[in-house]
Amino acid sequence: MAQVPAKAWKNYIARLRRLNNTAALKMESFLVHNDTSTDAGLKAALDYAYALSTTYGEGAAALSCEMYDAMAMLSGVNVPPAVPAPTADYGEVAQTVQGIMKWSKLPQSIGAGVGRLVKQAGVDTTMQNALRDGAEWAWVPQGDTCAFCIMLASNGWQKASKKALKNGHAEHIHSNCDCTYAVRFNEKTTVAGYDPEKYKAEYDDAEGGNWREKLNSLRRELGED
């Protein structure tokens, strides 16, 4: 079976993480040193958040294109080069930042929101190209994994479907998470270390009669509640 080596996958994840974290930290620093209580101050913060999400989102999308094309080559298929997904537009950025500000003015919380927008551009790139080419995808955990990511990973490899999207974006993007989608074009290709059967066993063994009950059980086991 052809595999993306674990070292190569971890390096890919680390590069994505640096982009997410750099954008988040720069946003935090801006908020620490600038007053956003005025209309002008808020506008400046939104402008900066948009600039960060665009610059670093483009980087995340480019990295995702590289990995997508590498998986296609590994699978031995001939598909068009991956196309970067659009980064968040100004309205999406403003909605994210102001939405967070309604419940938290902490720079860390708002910075994390900007980091999520950067990650979103990378994940959207993978998903949109997979839909274009009829590839399969799987949610591959990395590092400390939350209950929801375990549940997603338990699905294993699945045919790319718009059902996984909400308003054109991946539904499950959250802070402090290195998990992301991998793609493949045949059953002979995978990511080294990804074991969907292990995650399926964890999910199946969780108490509950439906997915919500099982998810809550996993959260209790992981100390998330």
Where in this protein do the model-derived segments appear?
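Domain-core detector
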Residues: 1-174, 183-225
